[in-house]
Design a protein with these regions (language model features):
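Flexible, solvent-exposed loop/hinge segments and secondary-structure transition points
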Residues: 23-29, 53
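Bacterial Sec-dependent signal peptides at the C-terminal "C-region" and cleavage site
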Residues: 13-24
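Sec-dependent N-terminal signal peptides
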Residues: 4-14
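Short beta-strand elements
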Residues: 164-179
Length: 179
């Protein structure tokens, strides 16, 4: 019995250690981008029959030169990078990260500026959608002396007074979103 108690304590201690985040080390020249979870981080995404699911936002982080020209995507959430939306009914969620999509300037066969299931972004720049605050480490090449880190954070179907659900395509407050 005593041996079983010690084993349980040992397993509990091991589980505590295994849940800690990996320590990120920074060197001279590295840039730390810290995204802080705010009050509205989780959004009620409508599923059906008035049932909602709490969803974190879609996020894109990219570099631009000092004139505002797109250079490279550093990080983008997995769902938009691979079009792996749940229960979307084929809706590609063009309203999710419109600034990043148009900044990249890559137009796909269907006329939209966001990745497709057939042409997803590479795994190296996409990652799971963070459910809270997180850090990104940038290690710019020596050739890149000055740049702007641009971040877009948005919720699909987050209709509000500025971008109402009933706005029609062509109107200035149309978000492109559909439930």
């Amino acid at each position: 019995m005593k041996k079983m108690g010690l084993t349980l304590i040992y397993l509990w201690l091991v589980s505590l250690c295994s849940c800690q985040q990996e320590l990120i080390e920074y060197e001279k020249g590295d840039v730390k981008v810290h995204i802080e979870q705010g009050e509205q981080w989780l959004h009620d995404f409508p599923l059906f029959l008035g049932i909602n699911k709490k969803n974190p936002p879609q996020i894109a982080i990219w570099l631009e030169d000092t004139q505002g020209n797109y250079l490279s995507t550093v990080y983008v959430t997995h769902k938009i990078a691979t079009q792996s939306w749940q229960a979307s009914g084929g809706n590609r969620r063009k309203e999710a990260l419109p600034h990043w999509c148009y900044s990249r300037g890559i137009k796909y066969d269907d006329g939209l500026y966001l990745p497709t299931k057939k042409e997803p972004l590479t795994d190296g720049i996409s990652g799971a959608t963070p459910h809270g605050s997180f850090d990104i480490k940038l290690s710019p090449t020596t050739a890149l002396k000055k740049f702007v880190v641009t971040i877009e954070i948005n919720h699909s179907t987050d209709f509000n007074e500025a971008f109402p659900k009933l706005a029609k395509e062509g109107e200035t407050n149309y978000s492109g979103g559909k439930e």
